[in-house]
């Protein structure tokens, strides 16, 4: 029964191993971040063999990655080309590969085994291979002398056998990069440790001191050379490369904490702002300084940056910028300066250092920046002597020898200027005018007081050569004044001194006495200065002007009606105006010289009408006493005759020229000369041809051209032969004004016939060598083709002493000297002992567009008061020759002296520029110009720059260089505007005003 009442045990299916608290805590726990799990995770590497598990990922030699060949016995890895010896893919072994170090050690172990068998130490050698400490045990136990010698000898053999057959690479050991190799060597090369413990036994067996080092180096793997750490620059200088994180190099945007920068320079919260503008990175990316916590925008920097810096960047708040920017600092100095300023600087130290500096008694010199030195040039001794001993000054450029030098009409660019801007003041003009009038009056008084020369001899005229001659403005004035000394009546109103000479030339001889020259006023000429200004009487010049190119003297004609003088049935023949002369065109040269082309008269007339009309050499009938000799009456008669001449020649170019325009001619300035000089020869008026007589044998005196009247035999202008010739022509005139040829004198007929022969045969007269200075009479009218082929003159070389003629420079060069082949032969201009055969040369430089003079003479040439001569200074000797050269020169010099002593003495023939023969004639030179050089004797051998009006002196011969383009500059403008009187007056220079000289461009 009790068995029935026994209860059964209840079994519950519950897990009693643990409670539910862990699960409850896991459900109630906060969420976990994944960063810890990611960081804790490590990539599982593949299981590799133990031998290759420690191989390096980069080459042990060059420390670069790539395809590497791994050693099977050590962790070393190499490129195929970095192995020792280098390998190729075909040379790779099929089985295991050992590096050079492992190969050497394997051979070493094998040799040790063989050596142990030889010496009967097989057991010990076997133990040595099994136990790494066998060598130490061997040394600890006592050994005999024979055993020690055997061991030492074995070590030497091992080192010799360990040398491979091929040499190692050029690289040596490298301390910081061979850490793995050193560890492996310590593990594997334990058997080498006893070598250091027994140096006494090894050293006596070594033959060379570095044999042990070489043996150790031969066992190492090849490595590239690198400086040790103590020699390498470890200072982080600005601009050096810095290590980047792997995320930056791979470009992965890794999530970082909020206080760090991302790789784009954007700064999340907490906000960091720019040090300059205090704005965040939302404006622009910020740049973090690598040496301080400051940040900057790229645009806030000075100067602003265009890109983010790649290396280390230092902000401008550091003092190192001032010190490190110096160019003379080396790398070691930069590192020292950078390390010095790395720590914080004490303000107290700065103050004390400043006080010590300012209280120093002898402060150090400041570093002064060396300024860039200009290129220095050594001043020649010739220029120094020129400033030390200046020559005497020449006359002013505006007035020379009492004659005004004008520069022509201003250019178009200067026409807008008023007359007062480029002319003298009114007071200066009045003073200049009074001086010119007083000068002319004194010249007339001097010339009128001279004695009249002897009359013309008719017999000498027949034998002498008949050459066409004409008188210029300056020479006619003085020559006609001395022709007739008859006084003028006191009641004649004379307008200017030129009227005296004009009336005297006309043959007037009233009984009354003339007034004094001081009482003569020039008021009428001043009033009519625009039409007929008074010119200066410079006197005749005995020269033959040699023309070089076509120069046509053309000017406007007056529009006044022809007037006849009261009491005379015919107009005054031969009275012409200067502006009516046509400019002659010269034929080719006739002397064999390139610059001696022809003959031309060049006058100084820069403004329209010329001076009072005393222009004719042909005498006219005497005037009645009641006729007033004024400039206007004579001007009208000259205009009448000029119109008559132009009607014979044909259409003239002078009709088309507006009134007031100056003639396009070359002006040559000649100084005043004595009254006894001969007449200036020219061919200016020889272009006019006298017509053939009519069928009835009568010729009208009005049809006689200027050329026929002026082309007379070369006799003095002041003789009475011309007056007699004119009177004989008037005696045979009939009532109608025609001349009966049958009634003419025989001499007059011969003269007219000879003139006609010159007109008909110009080529024969021109080709004759004696007529170089002459000019054909009709070449201008009969040979227009020749005129077009002629060359116009570039410049004129004019003498100042009255001898010789002016030479035109029509080509680029002009040679001056006493030689026969010179363009300007100085013997024609006077005698001087200090001139050379080839004295100087004038040439035109295309680069500088200027004329230049080059001196060849040892006497020198003075240009514009500056001496240009040869350099006679002692030249510095070159470097002394070597001993061998000096000995050879001494032998040659000694041999030359011996030959001179053996030869008979003869007079040494010397070449000299001075003429050999009779004694030289004296000249006006006191000494050669080269004597004016300073004591050093260094003359200036450069070229002289020539301008318009440059003064040239060759010895005692004086010349003036004139540029034709400068003297003939024409105003550019419309012809209709030039006809306006007001504008023409502004553009033209008045003759009584002193113009200001201006430089002009060279042609």
Curated annotation (Swiss-Prot):
Disruption phenotype: Mutant embryos die at mid- to late gestation with diverse developmental defects, including edema and internal hemorrhage. They show a global growth retardation whith 14.5 dpc embryos in a comparable size to 11.5 dpc wild-type embryos. They also present impaired development of the skeleton, the assocaited skeletal muscle and the brain. It comes from the Eukaryota. GO terms for cellular component: nucleus; Sin3-type complex; transcription repressor complex. Expressed mainly in heart, brain, lung, liver and testis. There is a cross-link at residues 467, 899, 972, 986, 990 (Glycyl lysine isopeptide (Lys-Gly) (interchain with G-Cter in SUMO2)). Transcriptional repressor acting as key scaffolding subunit of SIN3 complexes which contributes to complex assembly by contacting each core subunit domain, stabilizes the complex and constitutes the substrate receptor by recruiting the H3 histone tail. SIN3 complexes are composed of a SIN3 scaffold subunit, one catalytic core (HDAC1 or HDAC2) and 2 chromatin targeting modules. SIN3B complex represses transcription and counteracts the histone acetyltransferase activity of EP300 through the recognition H3K27ac marks by PHF12 and the activity of the histone deacetylase HDAC2. GO terms for molecular function: phosphatidylinositol binding; transcription corepressor activity; transcription corepressor binding; zinc ion binding. Residues 202-241 are annotated as: SIN3 interacting domain 1. It is found in: Nucleus. Residues 328-364 are annotated as: SIN3 interacting domain 2. Keywords: Isopeptide bond, Metal-binding, Nucleus, Phosphoprotein, Repeat, Repressor, Transcription, Transcription regulation, Ubl conjugation, Zinc, Zinc-finger. The modification Phosphoserine is found at residues 131, 134, 555. Zn(2+) 3 binds at residues 274, 277, 297, 300. Residues 814-868 form the FHA domain. It holds the Pfam family PHD. This is PHD finger protein 12.
């Amino acid at each position: 029964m009790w068995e029935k009442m026994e209860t059964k045990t209840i079994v519950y299916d519950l897990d009693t191993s643990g409670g539910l608290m862990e699960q409850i805590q896991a459900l109630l726990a906060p969420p976990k971040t994944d960063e810890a799990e990611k960081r804790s995770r490590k990539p599982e590497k593949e299981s590799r063999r133990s031998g290759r598990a420690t191989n390096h990922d980069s080459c042990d030699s060059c420390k670069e990655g790539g395809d590497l060949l791994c050693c099977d016995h050590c962790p070393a890895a190499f490129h195929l080309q970095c192995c020792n010896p280098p390998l190729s893919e075909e040379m790779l072994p099929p089985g295991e590969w050992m590096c050079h170090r492992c190969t050497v050690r394997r051979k070493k172990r094998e040799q040790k085994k063989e050596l142990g068998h030889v010496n009967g130490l097989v057991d010990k050698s076997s133990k040595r291979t099994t136990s790494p400490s066998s060598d130490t045990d061997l040394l600890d136990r006592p050994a005999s002398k024979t055993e020690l010698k055997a061991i030492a000898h074995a070590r030497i053999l091992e080192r010799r056998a360990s040398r491979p057959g091929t040499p190692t690479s050029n690289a040596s050991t490298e301390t910081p990069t061979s850490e793995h190799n050193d560890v492996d060597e310590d593990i594997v090369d334990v058997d080498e440790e006893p070598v250091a413990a027994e140096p006494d036994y090894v050293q006596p067996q070594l033959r060379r001191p570095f044999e042990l080092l070489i043996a150790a180096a031969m066992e190492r793997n090849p490595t590239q050379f690198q400086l040790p750490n103590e020699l390498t620059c470890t200072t982080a200088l600005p601009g050096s490369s810095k290590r980047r994180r792997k995320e930056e190099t791979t470009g992965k945007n890794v999530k970082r904490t909020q206080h760090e920068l991302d790789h784009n320079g954007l700064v999340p919260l907490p906000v960091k702002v720019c040090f300059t503008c205090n704005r965040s990175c939302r404006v622009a990316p910020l740049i973090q300084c690598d040496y301080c916590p400051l940040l900057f925008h790229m645009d806030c920097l000075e100067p602003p940056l265009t890109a983010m810096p790649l290396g280390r960047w230092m902000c401008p708040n550091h003092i190192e910028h001032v010190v490190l920017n110096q160019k003379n600092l080396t790398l070691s100095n930069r590192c020292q300066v950078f390390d010095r300023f790395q720590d914080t600087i004490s303000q107290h130290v700065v103050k004390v250092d400043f006080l010590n500096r300012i209280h120093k008694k002898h402060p150090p010199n400041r570093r002064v920046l060396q300024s860039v030195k200009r290129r220095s040039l050594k001043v020649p001794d010739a220029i120094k002597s020129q400033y030390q001993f200046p020559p005497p000054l020449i006359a002013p450029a505006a007035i020379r020898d009492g004659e005004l030098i004008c520069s022509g009409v201003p250019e178009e660019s200067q026409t807008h200027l008023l007359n007062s801007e480029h002319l003298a003041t009114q007071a200066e003009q009045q003073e200049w005018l009074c001086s010119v009038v007083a000068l002319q009056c004194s010249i007339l008084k001097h010339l009128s007081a001279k004695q009249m020369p002897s009359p013309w001899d008719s017999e000498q005229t027949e034998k002498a050569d008949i050459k066409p001659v004409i008188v210029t403005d300056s020479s006619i004035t003085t020559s006609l004044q001395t022709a007739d000394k008859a006084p003028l009546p006191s009641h004649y109103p004379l307008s200017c001194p030129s009227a005296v000479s004009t009336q005297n030339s006309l043959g007037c001889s009233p009984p009354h006495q003339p007034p004094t020259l001081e009482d003569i006023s020039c008021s009428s000429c001043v009033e009519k200065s625009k039409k007929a200004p008074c010119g200066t009487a410079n006197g005749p010049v005995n020269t033959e002007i040699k023309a070089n190119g076509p120069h046509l003297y053309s000017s406007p004609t007056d529009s006044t009606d022809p007037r006849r003088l009261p009491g005379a049935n015919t107009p005054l023949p031969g009275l012409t105006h200067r502006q009516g002369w046509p400019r002659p065109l010269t034929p080719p040269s006739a002397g064999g010289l390139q610059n001696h082309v022809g003959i031309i008269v060049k006058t100084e007339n820069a403004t329209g009408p010329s001076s009072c009309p005393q222009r004719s050499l042909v005498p006219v009938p005497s005037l009645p006493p009641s006729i007033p000799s004024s400039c206007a009456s004579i001007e009208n008669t000259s205009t009448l005759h000029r119109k008559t001449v132009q009607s014979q020649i044909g259409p003239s170019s002078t009709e088309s020229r507006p009134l007031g325009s100056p003639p396009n001619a070359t002006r040559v300035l000649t100084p005043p000369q004595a009254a006894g000089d001969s007449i200036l020869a020219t061919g200016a008026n020889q272009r006019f041809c006298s017509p053939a007589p009519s069928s009835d044998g009568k010729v009208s005196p009005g049809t006689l051209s200027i050329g026929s009247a002026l082309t007379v035999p070369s006799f003095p202008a002041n003789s009475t032969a011309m007056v007699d010739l004119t009177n004989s022509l008037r005696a045979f005139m009939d009532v109608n004004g025609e001349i009966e040829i049958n009634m003419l004198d025989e001499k007059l007929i011969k003269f007219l016939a000879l003139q006609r022969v010159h007109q008909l045969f110009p080529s024969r007269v021109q080709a004759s060598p004696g007529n170089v200075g002459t000019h054909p009479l009709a070449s201008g009218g009969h040979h227009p083709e020749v005129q077009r082929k002629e060359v116009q003159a570039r410049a004129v070389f004019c003498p100042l002493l009255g001898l010789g003629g002016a030479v035109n420079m029509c080509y680029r060069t002009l040679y001056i000297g006493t030689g026969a082949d010179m363009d300007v032969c100085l013997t024609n201009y006077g005698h001087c002992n200090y001139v050379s055969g080839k004295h100087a040369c004038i040439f035109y430089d295309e680069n500088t567009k200027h004329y230049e003079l080059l001196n060849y003479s040892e006497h020198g040439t003075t240009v514009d008061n500056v001496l240009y001569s040869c350099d006679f200074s002692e030249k510095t000797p070159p470097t002394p020759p070597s001993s061998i050269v000096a000995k050879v020169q001494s032998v040659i010099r000694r041999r030359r002296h011996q030959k001179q002593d053996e030869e008979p003495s003869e007079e040494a023939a010397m070449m000299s520029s001075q003429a050999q023969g009779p004694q030289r004639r004296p000249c006006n030179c006191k000494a050669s110009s080269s004597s004016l050089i300073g004591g050093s004797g260094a003359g200036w051998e450069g070229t002289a720059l020539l301008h318009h009006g440059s003064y040239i002196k060759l010895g005692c011969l004086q010349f003036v260089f004139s540029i034709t383009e400068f003297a003939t500059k024409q105003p550019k403008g419309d012809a209709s505007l030039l006809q306006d009187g007001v504008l023409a007056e502004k553009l033209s220079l008045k003759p009584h005003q002193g113009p200001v000289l201006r430089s002009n461009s060279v042609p």
